A protein has these predicted regions:
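Conserved AdoMet/S-adenosylmethionine-binding subsite of the radical SAM
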Residues: 1-123
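Auxiliary Fe-S-binding modules of radical SAM enzymes
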Residues: 89-167
Length: 167
């Protein structure tokens, strides 16, 4: 969280007016910058990609150690009722047997009971073209409704509530 001082002031001001405030984060922040106000959010969407450190480094360019450590601290500090894991379901990358099993294990370990499933799509591809950047994802990547529902069933059979968005 690069603008922690602003976010802290904003959350406090919103609370004065009785406004609900949510946070969406990839979790790659310094805990000492947010520990004193992270519990003030009404809900937190926490993005998780690959739970395997080697795959995380391969696909995101960095280790997921800080992210997972912050998730553990967040679950302990803010409480798991506010916490919703978000995961983009990318075939062969995040929508794998191993990654979903690791996600279930992580949720059970931390007591997290809600997950947002975000099926992969190519809607952002045009932005890359407009910016003159190469789109690195394979055009053939597709996740079917059936595959998404199967992942949803696996999570829900482990007492993890699922929200499917962009489906």
């Amino acid at each position: 969280m690069l603008q922690a001082d602003f976010v802290r002031a904003f959350v406090n001001k919103c609370a004065q007016f009785g406004l609900s405030v949510g946070l969406e984060t990839c979790g790659n922040f310094k805990w000492e910058h947010v520990h004193d106000f992270i519990s003030d959010f009404d809900f937190i969407y926490f993005d998780i990609k690959c739970l395997d450190e080697e795959l995380s480094t391969k696909y995101t360019g960095q280790s997921n150690r800080t992210i997972l450590r912050n998730l553990e601290k967040l679950a302990a500090t803010a409480g798991t009722s506010k916490l919703i894991i978000s995961i983009a379901l990318i075939p062969g990358i995040t929508a794998t047997e191993e990654n979903i099993s690791s996600l279930i294990e992580l949720c059970k370990k931390l007591g997290i009971t809600s997950v947002r499933l975000l099926p992969y799509h190519t809607l952002g591809k045009g932005k890359y073209v407009e910016l003159g950047r190469k789109y690195l994802m394979d055009d053939g990547l597709k996740i079917t409704d059936e595959e998404v529902r199967e992942i949803q069933k696996r999570l829900e059979s482990n007492s993890i509530h699922c929200i499917i968005e962009g489906f």
